[in-house]
Amino acid sequence: MCSKYGIFLVILQQNIVYLEMAEITIKDKTFKTSIPEAEILKRIQVVADRINHDMKDKNPLLLAVLNGSFIFAADLMRMLTIPCEISFVKLASYQGTTSTGTIKEVLGINEDLTNRTVIIVEDIVETGLTMKRMIETLGTRNPESIHICSLLVKPERLQ
């Protein structure tokens, strides 16, 4: 069982002034931009720099949780300069835009994780239940260490 864990977070500033708010509609929901893309990319670069430094001799496997982390994982991969690999896992824990509390693996992990450094790449950690399940599942596959890299965290929702 893996005993090493770490967290890389893209921590975004909360006190940003927005001059123009873009809108996007997905299905029947309309969203307004709350964090400018340039700010997100700047913070992803900070995290990539840390991963480049901390993992330089590890050849980590980035395990991106689909669908949400796809763009974040792509941006992060472009900024990494160390040897690394990426793979994808798809879990279902939402019904529409609400977390169900139940996590179902839809697309599993095919890689051998024995003695590998694994970085789980997630877009949003809301309740933490998905991360808990992933760490438990990955830990049974004997990785050297497991780290979490999340774009956003909702601390008030963590369980």
Regions found by a protein language model. Name each.
Residues 4-159:
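PRPP-associated nucleotide enzymes
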